[in-house]
């Protein structure tokens, strides 16, 4: 993420594609802008869209292959140059395009000698191959080669446990991530009170959908996440109707920190260094990068300040409070700690 100062004028909020190109069958690029945004809004939108694009977009891939009586994935098959493991890795790289849901069957059945590519996969009508030239295997002898495949539409990266199946069926780690990379940059425009921000968003996809299609799907997914809040009042949801549902504790992390700050007597917080708290190295490094060195520094930050720290996660927030409770008993927290 990059910030720069540029000259600009205030306009109605709008977005447009400023660059679009196809670098190869499996690499599409798009660059978009959204403006004008108030200070801080570009970061909010950029972070949300980046996460939604990388983790919420659905993709179709091969998830299982059945070779017949093959003892294990490191086996070699007579007349085939590649091992079973190499063939599985090649199948994992095949990029598919579809709108199917659930599991579908596909297959490969050819006779050597010849090269096998993605074009040789027999697919259901609803599935297309993005790059038919992707290699799968090389048959060096006149043998019959048949594989049964399973295809699934999903999202994210799904790792399968490696097992030796007696029927020769092997799982393939599913990479259902059509968006290969996302980058955003923020440019500040105007002067004084007229200052606003422009968000530039760059998207690279694997060719199964265009960057514009990916942006639309990510935006739709984000909207769907917030819809329950918009309809909650209309549905007349009450505590009585939802008494069996989980309710987050009212005593939040931020309230706990606020209570600590209210204490005026006791151990000086600027004499307690975060090194003494025995925090996990990941949490400790996040705090150090944000120039938080003492307990006073930590308690001077709001919950929002902490969540804005690079690489800081919800788990880090919980770890900080759990550590404070462990090393500083609640009666001490309530009565003795001070600034």
UniProtKB/Swiss-Prot annotation:
| EC class of the enzyme, as a word | transferase
Location in the cell reads:
Plastid, Chloroplast
Which SUPFAM superfamilies does the record cross-reference, listed alphabetically? C-terminal domain of RNA polymerase alpha subunit, Insert subdomain of RNA polymerase alpha subunit, RBP11-like subunits of RNA polymerase
Partners and quaternary state?
In plastids the minimal PEP RNA polymerase catalytic core is composed of four subunits: alpha, beta, beta', and beta''. When a (nuclear-encoded) sigma factor is associated with the core the holoenzyme is formed, which can initiate transcription.
What protein is this chain from? DNA-directed RNA polymerase subunit alpha
Cellular component (GO) terms are: chloroplast; DNA-directed RNA polymerase complex; mitochondrion
Keyword vocabulary terms for this entry: Chloroplast, DNA-directed RNA polymerase, Nucleotidyltransferase, Plastid, Transcription, Transferase
For this protein, the Enzyme Commission number is 2.7.7.6
The record's principal subcellular location, in a coarse class, is plastid
Q: What does this protein do?
A: DNA-dependent RNA polymerase catalyzes the transcription of DNA into RNA using the four ribonucleoside triphosphates as substrates.
The record's InterPro entries line, in alphabetical order, gives:
DNA-dir_RNA_pol_insert, DNA-dir_RNA_pol_RpoA/D/Rpb3, DNA-dir_RpoA, RBP11-like, RNAP_asu_C, RNApol_insert_sf
Tell me the protein family, please: Belongs to the RNA polymerase alpha chain family.
The question of whether Plastid is a record keyword is answered with yes
Q: Which reaction does it catalyse?
A: RNA(n) + a ribonucleoside 5'-triphosphate = RNA(n+1) + diphosphate
- What GO biological process terms does the UniProt entry carry, in alphabetical order? DNA-templated transcription
Q: Which HAMAP family match?
A: RNApol_bact_RpoA
The domain comment in this protein's record states:
The N-terminal domain is essential for RNAP assembly and basal transcription, whereas the C-terminal domain is involved in interaction with transcriptional regulators and with upstream promoter elements.
Q: What GO molecular function annotations does the UniProt record carry, in alphabetical order?
A: DNA binding; DNA-directed RNA polymerase activity; protein dimerization activity
Q: Where is this region: Alpha C-terminal domain (alpha-CTD)?
A: 266-339
Q: Where is this region: Alpha N-terminal domain (alpha-NTD)?
A: 1-233
